Each structure stands twice: as structure tokens, then as C-alpha cells.
Amino acid sequence: YLASFNANQRRNIRRERKAVQQAGLQVSAIAAEAITPELLARMHGFYEDHCRRWGMWGSKYLTEEFFSLAQPLRQHLVLFSAHRQGEDPHQPIAMSLCVREGDHLWGRYWGSTVEIDNLHFEVCYYAPIEWAIAQGIRHYDPGAGGSHKRRRGFVARPHASLHRWYEPQFAGLIKRWLPLANAQQLEEVEAVNAELPFSGRQIPLAPEQGKIEG
């Protein structure tokens, strides 16, 4: 993973990871049968608090019921617990939730009770990447958005979404606007990927604009 970056970004990543260690923290992966209902309840608490901090932009999609229903599916779940060094991983101060299927790992949601520099990067990116490599997982998707992701080696890719408007006049306006919006998004993907801090690596850029329908 580190070898794919230029020298400057390798130093940055090592520095960010070291900062978390110097804060007296370590991150442990808790997967499958080791995940208890209590841990899922804690994860919900972290998630809810994180969404609350962002107010109207919090995008709170998941409910408490979702986390309680996730218990039977825990063979597909991985929790990354940030805790004090030498202490119980089941007593976290921050957590992230990932989903695993085959050789794919998906991450998106996290939360923390403390503000520590680079903790988000460690819990959401570096620790899951390290765990995925050890498990032979080939693909890790950290979720949508976030310009900071490119500094951690994540290639921007376009994703399709489906929307429906029930007001015909408004739907017509949106439909006419979509081709331009999609073209602009693809240009942004190209621009983001052109700035990836890789060293001599071929970067798969966005597909031709015709690949996404308006």
C-alpha cells in the first residue's frame, strides 16, 4: 500500500498513524461472531452522535432498529474499535462500521467521543486497509464523497443513483439538466484522479462521458 505513493505522501501517512499511537490509542478489528449486541449498540451511539454534530447535513440514514437487526448478519460485519492502549477493545472511544462480502470491504459510518488529530483517518482508512490486506481482501471502498480520500489513495469513481420526482414540471427541468450535471461530475472525477499522490502508477480515470446515462 505505502509503496504505491510518492515519498512525501508515505511520510504523511506514517506521521498520521504515529500521531494516533502517541495519543495512547490503538485500533482493533472486531469481526463476525466476536461482535456483540452491546458493541452494535455502541456503534449506533457513535453514529447518532456524529450525525447530530453535523446538524441538517448529518445524513442520518440508519436507525437504532437497523443496528439491532444487524446482529444476525454479523458474519458480514467488521467493527474497528479505537481504544486506550492495553485496554479492552469493547470499551472504545471511537468506532467505524464496515461490511464485508467475499474479497470486498465497504466502509462508511463512524463516530468518536473525543477529538484527536488523525483518528478519523486511522479508524476509517488505515486500520481497515491494513486489516483487509491481512485478510486477502482486494477491494476497499470507504464510501462516497470527501476530498481527503484521494490523499489516502482512493481513486474517484462515478456511481449511478436513482431518483423520482412526483411533480411533472420539476421532473422535466431536472431531466434536461442531468446530462450537463453528469458531464461536470465526470470532469471532476478526472481532475481529482489527476492529483492522486501515486508514484509512477497508472491511475484508472473516469469512463467516457457516454457511459453514464442522463
Cite the ranges covered by each PLM segment.
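A conserved beta-strand-loop-helix scaffold within acyl/acetyltransferase catalytic domains
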Residues: 1-118, 163-164, 196-214
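Surface-exposed beta-strand edges and their flanking turn/coil or helix-capping segments
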Residues: 3-5, 40-43, 108-111, 120-122, ...
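A generic secondary-structure signal for well-formed alpha-helical elements
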Residues: 5, 9, 24, 47-55, ...
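Sparse, context-dependent recognition of short Cys/His-centered cofactor- or disulfide-binding micro-motifs
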Residues: 10-12, 52, 65-67, 90, ...
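Short, surface-exposed linear patches
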Residues: 11-17, 50, 66, 128-131, ...
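Short C-terminal domain-edge/linker segments immediately following a structured domain
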Residues: 20-24, 58-61, 114, 126-130, ...
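Conserved catalytic-core subdomain
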Residues: 24, 142-214
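Acyl-donor binding region in acyl/amide transferases
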Residues: 102-168
